[in-house]
Each structure stands twice: as structure tokens, then as C-alpha cells.
Amino acid sequence: MKQDSRNLYLAIGLSLLVLIGWNYFFAGPQVEKARQAQIVREQQAQTQTTSDTTARSDLNVPGQRSLPGESPQTQLSRPEALAASPRVKLDTPNLFGSINLRGARIDDVSLKAYRETVAKDSPNIVLLSPSGTPAPYYADAGFVAPAEAGLLLPKSDTLWSADREVLTPEAPVTLTYDNGQGLIFHRTISVDDRFMFTLTDKVENKTDKPVTLYPYSLVSRHGRPVTAGYAVLHEGMVGVIGDNGLQEITYDKIHKEENATKSFKGTGGWLGFTDKYWAAVIAPDQATPFEGRFSERGTTTPLYQTDALGPALTIAPGGTGGDMSRLFAGAKETQTLDDYRNELGIKKFDLLIDWGYFYFITRPMFWILHTIYQVVGNFGVAILCITVLVKAVFFPLANRSYLSMAKMKAIQPQMLALRERYADDKVKQQQELMELYKREKINPVAGCLPMLIQIPVFFALYKVLFVTIEMRQAPFFGWIRDLSAPDPTNIFNLFGLLPFDPTHLPMIGHFLAIGIWPLIMGVSMFFQMKMNPEPADPVQKQMFSWMPVIFTFMLGTFPSGLVIYWTWNNTLSVLQQSLIMKRAGVKVELWDNLMSTFRKKAVT
């Protein structure tokens, strides 16, 4: 097999890998995202007939399969729904919103530090919304009991009283409800200065009989959420329950489950919902066993729910009993999740971020990138620095590869002579070439090793850029204001001079996301390939000539931070190869190859 053929096959393989990855991670998910948007539009166009039923209605309590739910509600705007019930204001350094006194729900949470877009007047991210709105999403907790007990327990329409009007990190709020039958319920809600609520429930039994209750906590989400739709990212139900490992259940998957329910038992853990950057999850007492459940109900408008049911709590006459649970509602900041795991002992809470199967590569990559960022103050510059660091780490292997390539160039006359001598005997020609490689101690495929080496780093960095909120809306310089998003410029509308967005064109829009940085990347790849002489075979020559163009179109939809990494890596590779070739006494043919290419273009 010819050396050029080996390189061609490797190049084709790498190109196919990227093409498949592009289709899997980008083209397919865009179609899925459009499908999800259509589902949501259909849901919103229908009358909301699904009951606002929570865990109170069907938690598996001994002796009871169903508790009364709520009546259907008319869909309201978010401001109307918030004004319909008395509330306790929520105000922390990172959150604002309110606690609903009707039902004692946490159903109004927005994030102070995060906005929908990079525009200064962009709305804050709204995480939780009350029942009755187009997309209810809320957390709840309390107690259930067997139906035969005949106990009057707080429901979603129960009106609680509060001892203060504003909940802050310095001032917890205590809610109280007296059922008029000898049971008094107290719920103290505290919140830290980040995203964690602590719910401490206490029940006073003033009757003359013991009372048995089962504590629960839940997060409920009505309607099918629109997800980012990327296979590289999990969005949906998620949790760690005891020793059952990380559970990631998509909305499609739970719909296909028998009875649309999955349950697990264990001690310690958490469960809830995760989006790309945000999450709402409950964490029961880490020392108490519980049953965690993921479920879907409803037909017209699905209701997704994650809930935790604790063991029986028996309260003696005149006694007091209680339960504690936590609610995380906020941004999936890496350090914040690590702190909650370490300080609160929440089991594997850092897995709320989808680091993927290559956690052992992706997580260290983020740590290095974030450490550099803390020094340089810009994630784009940190990406440039980590590229240099990776080059330094793999320099010995890359050095051997480039030296092998330099030797290949040095023996080009001998290779050409052998091919001419044995032009009619391909087997003999190949044998003589392999003998020449062996005699000169050359690895004929070593030239592709640098590209193979950077593939794991490429995908690890891609994962970091895509899933970590620290990269969201992180600027670089100039027009790059979000390293986690594609380059906003586009050559097909003359970089904004023409009033249309080519990426919105049906069928071909995904291929037209060619901005300035993808173009620079294509040029850098073109220069890198011109470091080597053109293959003699016309087919191989055309293949290598088109590779920079193909990669430019494919990487156009990738996060701009990744394109910047690839561009800088190509540039460093050209410089590194030039230095190594000069040290080996081999002429650097970049300029000659470029001039040869342009002269041929001019002649044609």
C-alpha cells in the first residue's frame, strides 16, 4: 500500500468520524428541537384539562392508592397566576421570586445573575412557575397518610399563614397550618445565598391517638419542555438514589416505560429535572431511606414528576414529629455543586452536570481551563493557553511524528525512483518502499498521529464548552460574546449587511453557518496541509484539497470556543512542524506549495 494511500484512508476515516459526529450531535438534534417546539405549540393551543395533581394524589402509601387531586384550572399568564394567591417574597443574592402561601409551594424562582441572551436588557432566566400558567414547574413537600386514617392533611389549595413577608438568607420563614382536628403543621423554609432551600417540617399531635404519616417531597413539571435536543447532553429526569447509580431518564423514555413510572429505593441521593444549564432537584435527608420515583401522567398535557417518599413517621399523642428535605433550584455551577456535595453530604451531587462517559477526561479538562481562566480573566484566552499546554504535554510524541514526516520528505527522491522502477509491479514496489522505510527507521503513518492525538482533547473540550454554565455567554474579543455559541457572523449575508439569516433556510440552513472564525479555521487547516507536498494521485490530491472546505462547513455550527481552539491548534502545529523540519535539515515547503497552488489556479 502506498504511503499516500495510507494517509488518504486515515484522512477519510477522520473526516467520516467528524461527519458522523456532526450529524449525530448537530443536524439530528436540530430536527428533534423543531419537533419538540411543535409539540409544545400543540399543547398550548389545547385547553388545559389536566388536573394539577401532585404526589399527594398517588404516592404509594400503604392502604391507599389515590388521594383527592385538584380540579382543572384555566390557563393564566404568569403575572395573573402570581397575583392570584398570597405570597412570601423571595430575595437572595442569586434568586428572586416568591413562595405561594396557598399550598406552601416554591413555584416562583428566577435567577438574578443569568439572562436569556447576552443583551443587557434581556429578561432574567425564569426557572419555576406556578400552577395555572402555560408551563407550571414547582416544588412541594409535606405528608400523606392512608385513606382509612381519615386525616385532614394540607393540600395544594390549603392556605398557610407566615411569620414574615420576605424570605432571605438571614431570615427564614415559618409557615403554619392548623387542620382544626388536633394536628398543627409547621414548615420552616430557609435559603442560602446561592440556590439551596431547606424545608423543615414539624407536626404537633394534640389528639389523644398516635398518628402515622409519610413524608414526601417532589418536583412537578407540566407539559413537554423544549430541550436543546443534543445527544451529547442529557435533559429530563435525573437522580442518584442510594447505590442505584446515576439515573438519566429522558421525556421520551419515561413515556415508553410500563405504567410510565420508574422507582428506586435507597439511602442518600437526590432526584429532579435538569435542563442544559439549570436544574430543580430535591434531596431528602441523606441518612434516611426513601423511595424515589420518576413518572409521567396525563394524555393531552403530560405531567412529569419526580418524588421521594420517606418511611412511616408515628407521632404519639401530645408529641411532635418532623422531616427535613432540601431543594436545589438554580444554575448548575460546577463549584457550587461540589460545595453542596462536600458541605451538605449530598451523594454524588456533582453528577447533576452531564460530564459524560469520559468524566475522567472532561472534568480535569474543565478544572485546568477554569484554573487558567482565574489567572487570565478570559475563557477564550484560557482556551488558547490550554491548547499550548496540550501541545507541550504531547510534544515528545508529536516531535517523533513530525521527525518521521521530515525524513519522509528527505527520501522523496528515492521513493519516486522506486515507483518509477517498479511501475508495472505494485507488489514489488510496495515491498521495496517498506524496506526503504525500515532502513531509514520511518513510520509511514506517523504523520497522522498528531491529528489522532487531539481528537480526545477536541471532544473533551467540546463537552466542557457545551455543558458547563461557566462557558455560557463567556466573551472572547470583538464579536464573540458567547464562546458556547456558534460564531454569530455569516459570510452568506455579508456579515450582517443583508437583512436575513441564512441559517434559517429550510434543509440547507445548517450548512450555511459560516462565520469569520470558521473561515479563519479553514485557512489555518489549508496552511497546515500545505506543509506537505501534494499527493501524486489525482483522487488523493482532490480529497486533500477539499478537506479544509469540508471542515469549515462542518465546524461552522460548533461553539465558537471550539473553533478558536481548532484554529489555534492548527497554527501551533504549523509552527511546530516548521521548527522540527528545520532542525532535521529538511526544507519547509509551505511557501513553495502555496505559490505552486496559486500559480496553477492562475493558469487554469
Curated annotation (Swiss-Prot):
UniProt entry tagged with the keyword Signal: no
Compositionally skewed regions (Low complexity) per UniProt: 43-58
Domain of life: Bacteria
One Gene Ontology biological process: protein transport
Main location: membrane
UniProt entry tagged with the keyword Transferase: no
Localisation per UniProt entry: Cell inner membrane
GO molecular function, one term: membrane insertase activity
Membrane topology (UniProt): Multi-pass membrane protein
Cellular-component GO terms for this entry: plasma membrane
TM segment ranges: 8-28, 349-369, 375-395, 449-469, 507-527, 546-566
Region (Disordered): 42-84
Classification via Gene3D superfamilies: 2.70.98.90
UniProt keyword list: Cell inner membrane, Cell membrane, Chaperone, Membrane, Protein transport, Transmembrane, Transmembrane helix, Transport
Subunit organization: Interacts with the Sec translocase complex via SecD. Specifically interacts with transmembrane segments of nascent integral membrane proteins during membrane integration.
Family: Belongs to the OXA1/ALB3/YidC family. Type 1 subfamily.
Function per UniProt: Required for the insertion and/or proper folding and/or complex formation of integral membrane proteins into the membrane. Involved in integration of membrane proteins that insert both dependently and independently of the Sec translocase complex, as well as at least some lipoproteins. Aids folding of multispanning membrane proteins.
Cross-referenced NCBIfam families: PRK01318.1-4, yidC_nterm, yidC_oxa1_cterm
PANTHER family associated with the record: CYTOCHROME C OXIDASE ASSEMBLY PROTEIN COX18, MITOCHONDRIAL, OXA1
Name of the featured protein: Membrane protein insertase YidC
Organism, scientific name: Beijerinckia indica subsp. indica (strain ATCC 9039 / DSM 1715 / NCIMB 8712)
Gene: yidC
